[in-house]
């Protein structure tokens, strides 16, 4: 008689006090039913055995964070999955933990880091956010986030800024 034990990196997950929680998953699918990302794009686009959102936590831990880190970014972090989970897994918290781990392990490119710094600066300074039209912003941002666009549709900005749209509505 032979006994084959298939671990699939579960021992390493069990050793991590934060990520251990994902092993409690009973694969009931409650998180899938409430996930807005899953509702819009389905599970096949993720290309893994475990579907989102719990699969976005499990897969990088089982099959390697470097190859599957993008799954942790495929979430709106609304928290609906955590609310409905019958075993109370903090799914959106674990997604954030995976994102943090990928940054800490240096898995982000220089251009990605710079793009987020520019985005932060523009978000903090309203004048910068209003500079340029939507077409120009779309081209610049999509160029900066070209790695992001491997897994997502390119970003497309509105032709008018939020402030312009707000002023138009205010005068109506």
Language-model features: locations:
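Phosphate-binding glycine-rich loops and their immediate beta-loop-alpha structural context
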Residues: 25, 29-32
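Ferredoxin-type iron-sulfur electron-transfer modules in oxidoreductases and energy-metabolism complexes
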Residues: 1-22, 38-141
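Short linear elements at protein peripheries
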Residues: 136-172
């Amino acid at each position: 008689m032979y006994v084959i034990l298939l671990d699939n990196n579960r021992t390493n997950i069990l050793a991590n006090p934060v990520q251990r929680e994902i092993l409690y998953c009973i694969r009931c699918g409650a998180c899938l039913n409430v996930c807005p990302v899953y509702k819009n794009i389905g599970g096949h686009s993720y290309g893994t055995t475990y579907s989102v959102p719990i699969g976005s936590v499990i897969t990088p831990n089982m099959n390697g964070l470097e190859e599957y880190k993008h799954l942790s970014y495929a979430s709106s972090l609304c928290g609906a999955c955590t609310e409905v989970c019958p075993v109370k897994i903090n799914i959106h918290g674990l997604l954030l933990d995976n994102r943090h781990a990928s940054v800490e392990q240096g898995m982000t490119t220089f251009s990605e880091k710079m793009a987020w710094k520019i985005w932060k600066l523009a978000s903090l300074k309203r004048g910068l956010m209003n500079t340029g039209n939507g077409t120009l912003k779309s081209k610049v941002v999509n160029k900066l986030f070209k790695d992001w666009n491997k897994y997502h549709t390119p970003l497309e900005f509105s032709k008018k800024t939020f402030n312009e749209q707000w002023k138009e509505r205010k005068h109506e």
